[in-house]
Amino acid sequence: QGLFSEINLASDKLGRKYADRNTKLCAIISKIAEGIADFSTDVDALGDAYEYLIGQFAAGSGKKAGEFYTPQQISNILSAIVTLDSQEPKSGPRRSLGSVFDFACGSGSLLLNVRHRMKAAGGSIGRIHGMEKNITTYNLARMNMLLHGVKDTEFEITHGDTLANDWDLLRETNPAKKPQFDAVVANPPFSYRWEPGEAMAEDMRFKNHGVAPKSAADFAFLLHGLHYLKDDGVMAIILPHGVLFRGGVEERIRTKLLNDGHIDTVIGLPANLFYSTGIPVCILVLKKCKQPDDVLFINAAEHFVKGKRQNQLTEEHIARIIDT
């Protein structure tokens, strides 16, 4: 429902006059129809073509790309991490993953990467959950799911504000009925400015750790995901490098997470991996019942291939991170 609600057929980009717009639309539809008539491959190829176009659009969009696209190389690392067994990661991928959640899902590419990795390893995946604030990007994600052959009964992408937690599914007050997910992945907007009210201090997501500052909601996103993670689940989130050393309330949240044993691994990545920013980033891996109590630090900041626009991680770089 509403999948094409953001398409503006009256846009001046199609022509100033009604007749001009009509002519151009007819030409576009005719070309698409010709392509479909010659298209005889499987659904995955159609979905991959759509994913490729999103990637090409992201490459040309610069900073705007950060709103909807996670580079494939980053997505591969996150999906590999959350599909490993939480207590015995050396044993390889899980045989099944009941649910996966991305609370800032963009075009849905990260969720689909988790699904693809599980399927490729001969495993099974249950329900896919996502949340996206931008209405256009929300529709992109739903379309991406359908074009990759994910049935509408197998996924639930919701349009809403994660920080406000305005998804009824997640606002269940009965602890016994609180939704929890086997895997949580996210690439939320970096250092996002927000306006937490006084009531946020009593929000169950932040009550035990503290509320992130107005200047940067990074830890608010992290705590949101951790709150809905199962006790034996794995969460992997991309955040700006600053979350590792900024002071004030962020330092207190970070210390509490460490003391509670929730931070499993910190992976430092090279700068300039994203279309939207050149700052260095890190991956934080979180668990609720991790063993042992120490934290693994992986410094991959110097391992990359320099590209024209962005630095690149090769398959070898990615494999070394995951194997470690």
What are these regions (language model features)?
Residues 95-104:
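Conserved class I S-adenosyl-L-methionine
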Residues 127-132:
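Conserved SAM-binding motif I beta-strand of class I
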Residues 140-176:
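S-adenosyl-L-methionine
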Residues 111, 136-140:
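Short alpha-helix immediately C-terminal to the canonical SAM-binding loop
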Residues 82, 122, 229-230:
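A generic alpha-to-beta junction signature in SAM-dependent methyltransferases
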Residues 107-123:
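Conserved SAM-binding loop of SAM-dependent methyltransferases across substrates and taxa
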Residues 1-87, 153-162, 268-271, 292-301, ...:
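Non-catalytic, mostly N-terminal accessory regions of nucleic-acid modification and defense proteins
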